[in-house]
């Protein structure tokens, strides 16, 4: 099934992913991250308290969940110092910003499928896109793709289901 999604995916995005394995930030993004870090490094020691990670991320427009923060802290603060330097913070934020870009790209792709704007990808939507891309997929193969992504069994693929299958198949 995943191979069917790979076949129908636009090659440019998967090729782009292979060419740039490490996410790159613009100078402006790096500056924003530096400013958020400096805001919480009030004493100028070059470190911030890991407890402030959530607030610093919020300052950059992210809404991290408690579990997500705990995981990040355990990955960064291996010695258990309770402190994080700018390099660690930059690494975390580079990852978060690239994930945000990825999600936005996936949602743009979703909208290309969902041309009737129902908020779902139907069999008809998928068949149209496959035809536009010149993919010769049988109705059975197309239905398999829907079935693989469709978690709630309504016969269509929602935005969340589409995000999940695209990330699961590592197409983005």
Curated annotation (Swiss-Prot):
Q: Which residues bind Ca(2+) 2?
A: 150, 152, 154, 156, 161
At which positions is Ca(2+) 1 bound?
41, 43, 45, 47, 52
Q: Which residues carry this modification: N-acetylalanine?
A: 2
Q: Where in the cell is it found?
A: Cytoplasm, Cytoskeleton, Microtubule organizing center, Centrosome; Cytoplasm, Cytoskeleton, Microtubule organizing center, Centrosome, Centriole; Nucleus envelope; Nucleus, Nuclear pore complex
Q: Where is this region: Disordered?
A: 1-30
Q: Does the keyword Acetylation apply?
A: yes
At which residues is the cross-link Glycyl lysine isopeptide (Lys-Gly) (interchain with G-Cter in SUMO2) found? Answer: 22
Q: Which InterPro entries match?
A: Centrin_CML-like, EF-hand-dom_pair, EF_Hand_1_Ca_BS, EF_hand_dom, RNA-helicase_DEAD-box_CS
EF-hand domain mapped to chain residues? 28-63, 64-99, 101-136, 137-172
Concerning Pfam families, the annotation shows: EF-hand_7 (PF13499)
A Gene Ontology biological process noted in the UniProt record is:
mitotic cell cycle
- Positions carrying Phosphothreonine are 26
Recite the other comments.
Answer: Binds two moles of calcium per mole of protein.
Indicate the quaternary assembly: Monomer. Homooligomer. Interacts with SFI1. Interacts with CCP110. Component of the XPC complex composed of XPC, RAD23B and CETN2. Component of the nuclear pore complex (NPC)-associated TREX-2 complex (transcription and export complex 2), composed of at least GANP, 2 copies of ENY2, PCID2, SEM1/DSS1, and either centrin CETN2 or centrin CETN3. The TREX-2 complex also associates with ALYREF/ALY and with the nucleoporin NUP153. Interacts with USP49. Forms a microtubule-associated complex with POC5, POC1B and FAM161A. Interacts with CCDC15.
Q: What does this protein do?
A: Plays a fundamental role in microtubule organizing center structure and function. Required for centriole duplication and correct spindle formation. Has a role in regulating cytokinesis and genome stability via cooperation with CALM1 and CCP110.
Its protein name is Centrin-2
Q: What is the lineage of its organism?
A: Eukaryota, Metazoa, Chordata, Craniata, Vertebrata
């Amino acid at each position: 099934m995943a191979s069917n999604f790979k076949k129908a995916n636009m090659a440019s995005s998967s090729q782009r992913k292979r060419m740039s394995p490490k996410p790159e930030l613009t100078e402006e993004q790096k500056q924003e991250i530096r400013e958020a870090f400096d805001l919480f490094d009030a004493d100028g020691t070059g470190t911030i308290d890991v407890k402030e990670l959530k607030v610093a991320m919020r300052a950059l427009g992210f809404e991290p969940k408690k579990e997500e923060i705990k995981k990040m802290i355990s990955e960064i603060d291996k010695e258990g110092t309770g402190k994080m330097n700018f390099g660690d913070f930059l690494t975390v934020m580079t990852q978060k910003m690239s994930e945000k870009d990825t999600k936005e790209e996936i949602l743009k792709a979703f909208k290309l499928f969902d041309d009737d704007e129902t908020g779902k990808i139907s069999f008809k939507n998928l068949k149209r896109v496959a035809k536009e891309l010149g993919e010769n997929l049988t109705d059975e193969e197309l239905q398999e793709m829907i079935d693989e992504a469709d978690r709630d069994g309504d016969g269509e693929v929602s935005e969340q289901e589409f995000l999940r299958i695209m990330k699961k198949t590592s197409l983005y």
